[in-house]
Each structure stands twice: as C-alpha cells, then as structure tokens.
Amino acid sequence: MNPAMINKIKKMQRDMLEAQKKLEQSIFTGTAGGGMVKVEATGDKRIVNIEIDSDVLNPEDKEMIQDTIVAAINDVMRKIDEETQDVMGAFTGGMPGFF
C-alpha cells in the first residue's frame, strides 16, 4: 500500500473511534405509555435514569407499569441502534453486519 492510502486508513480509524466514543457518551431517551414512562440510556446501552409519572403508580396496575417500562427500554435501545447504524454506517459504506 502506498503511504497516502495508509494515512487515509489511519485517519478513518481515528474518526471511527471518536464517533464511537461520542455515541457512547450520548444520552438517548425512550418513552412509552404516552410519556408515562421515560428511560434514559447512554450510547453503550447503560440505563442511567427511569422516570415514572406518579399518575401510573397504582399498585393494582403493576403489570401495566412493568409492560410500559419494558416498552420504554426497548424504545431507547432501538433509538441507540438506529443512531449507531447511521453514524457508524458512514464509515462502513453501509455494509451490513459491522454495527
């Protein structure tokens, strides 16, 4: 390989690592139940906050609350996956299976 190509590859690697680090530090929000439950997670899929509207804290609705929390977590994970695909896809040229 010629030196220009090697430098280009190294720059792309640095840019990818920076983009990945930025994604990991980003906060994503997922909601469910019309905003009754809000889940925040980092780009590396760590849940950092869960907010539950006090109007839904009825012990008789335990199953509904649990389902809504699961839906909010799934929503935020989907958003993280989509953003990761969008950001990192720029580096892989849209090749499937890399991120």
Language model features by range: what are they?
Residues 67, 71-75, 82:
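Short, residue-level hotspots on alpha-helical faces of the histone-fold
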Residues 9, 45, 69:
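Residue-level signature of catalytic and energy-coupling elements of molecular machines
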Residues 28-35, 39-51:
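N-terminal intrinsically disordered, cationic/polar leader segments
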Residues 50-62:
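A short interface-forming secondary-structure element
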Residues 1-29, 78-99:
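Long amphipathic alpha-helical segments used for membrane anchoring, targeting, substrate engagement
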